[in-house]
């Protein structure tokens, strides 16, 4: 069953596939979604406040945002901080990325009847994007289709191409 879920998630994020929608409450309590950004080029950035490489990539993502936002570029961040939302909010402010969309991934932890730590993944959007490490960045085109998963250099080149520079 786990393998089937993983294969389905990998199929969801193949280039050309419609991006799985993420519709959640954002850092300000408003409901936001990827589908509402159709018509824009969207970078979906999976990160966490405790992830040093994630935080180090924000200045680069901010520079891309400044360069392309007026041309229709948005950044939709998914934080892996469900158990520490205060640290998530603090990191957003510290790193100066309030202009981006921010939601939590939706992984809920709890203790079962035997006192063992368990996870409820039913609302976990990271599973829909086959996320296994952070940071992971997916680019979505104006039609809402997956362009691909990119590192910083690849992302620069792809955005130049997409915005005709």
Predicted regions mapped to residue ranges:
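N-proximal helix/coil linker or "cap" segments that precede and/or mark the start of modular domains
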Residues: 1-25, 35-40, 86, 90-93, ...
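Short beta-strand segments
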Residues: 45, 75-79, 104
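Conserved redox-active cysteine motifs that mediate thiol-disulfide chemistry
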Residues: 38-39, 45-63, 67
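Structural microenvironment flanking redox-active thiols in thiol-disulfide oxidoreductases
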Residues: 56-98, 109-124
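Active-site acidic short loop of glycosyltransferases
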Residues: 38-40, 70, 97, 131
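Short conserved loop adjoining the S-adenosyl-L-methionine
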Residues: 32-36, 125
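Thiol/disulfide oxidoreductase modules built on the thioredoxin-like
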Residues: 97, 107-164
């Amino acid at each position: 069953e786990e393998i089937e879920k993983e294969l389905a998630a990998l199929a969801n994020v193949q280039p050309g596939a419609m991006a799985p929608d993420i519709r959640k409450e954002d850092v300000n309590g408003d409901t936001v979604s990827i589908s509402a950004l159709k018509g824009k080029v969207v970078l979906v950035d999976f990160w966490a406040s405790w992830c040093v490489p994630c935080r180090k990539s924000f200045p680069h993502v901010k520079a891309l945002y400044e360069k392309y936002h007026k041309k229709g570029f948005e950044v939709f961040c998914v934080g892996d901080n469900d158990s520490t939302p205060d640290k998530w909010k603090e990191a957003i402010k510290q790193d100066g990325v309030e202009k981006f969309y921010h939601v939590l991934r939706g992984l809920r932890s709890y203790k079962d009847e035997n006192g063992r730590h368990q996870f409820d993944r039913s609302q976990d959007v990271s599973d829909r994007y086959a996320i296994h490490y952070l940071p992971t960045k997916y680019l979505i085109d104006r039609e809402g289709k997956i362009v691909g998963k990119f590192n910083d250099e690849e992302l620069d080149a792809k955005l130049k191409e997409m915005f005709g520079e």
